[in-house]
């Protein structure tokens, strides 16, 4: 017997056009984007589908990702695609909570909007940095 789990990505997986084919095909997806806009005041559809720099700003990326993930999840649920588990990487954990029924989409929009704002404020543009350490030994990692 096969089991299915949904894994939701975190920030960094966003790209212009994400979710567009679902948005164009399903009324329910458009409703998710409308709800996100009502809760946050952000035109999430424009954010996702039009070329812009805002999609790469934490303050906006997070609501765009969460909305897209939950809208697609809804389509999968409506199609009767069963799943036994949901998990997420960082931001994706919120979509996983929604998939599990622990967080409503509307409440999630509220939380994610604030999360994005606070994270953006914590590290203003041009300050701070991040590095990925790949294929180093433990000793080399300690030296870094």
List each model region and its residues.
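Helix-rich "cap/lid" substructures immediately adjacent to catalytic or cofactor-binding pockets
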Residues: 2-87, 136
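Alpha/beta catalytic cores of group-transfer enzymes, especially the acyltransferase/condensing modules
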Residues: 11-13, 38-40, 100-144
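An amphipathic alpha-helix/helix-turn recognition signal
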Residues: 31, 64, 90-91, 103, ...
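Short, glycine/charge-rich beta-strand/loop segments that flank catalytic centers
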Residues: 52-53, 87-91, 116, 128-132
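Hydrophobic side chains within alpha-helical segments
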Residues: 65, 72, 93-96, 110, ...
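Gly/Ala-rich beta-loop-alpha elbow adjacent to hydrolase catalytic centers
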Residues: 69, 84, 88-92, 96, ...
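Alpha-helix C-terminal capping segments
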Residues: 75-79, 97-103
């Amino acid at each position: 017997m096969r089991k299915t789990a949904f894994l939701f990505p975190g920030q960094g997986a966003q790209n212009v056009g994400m979710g567009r084919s679902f948005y164009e095909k399903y009324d329910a997806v458009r409703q998710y984007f409308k709800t996100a806009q009502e809760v946050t005041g952000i035109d999430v559809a424009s954010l996702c589908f039009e070329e812009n720099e805002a999609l790469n700003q934490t303050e906006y990326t997070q609501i765009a990702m969460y909305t897209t993930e939950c809208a697609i999840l809804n389509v999968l649920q409506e199609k009767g695609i069963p799943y036994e588990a949901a998990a997420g990487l960082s931001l994706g954990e919120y979509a996983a909570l929604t998939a599990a029924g622990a967080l409503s989409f509307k409440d999630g929009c509220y939380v994610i909007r604030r999360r994005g704002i606070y994270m953006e404020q914590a590290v203003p543009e041009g300050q701070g940095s991040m590095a990925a350490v790949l294929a180093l030994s433990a000793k080399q990692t300690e030296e870094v």
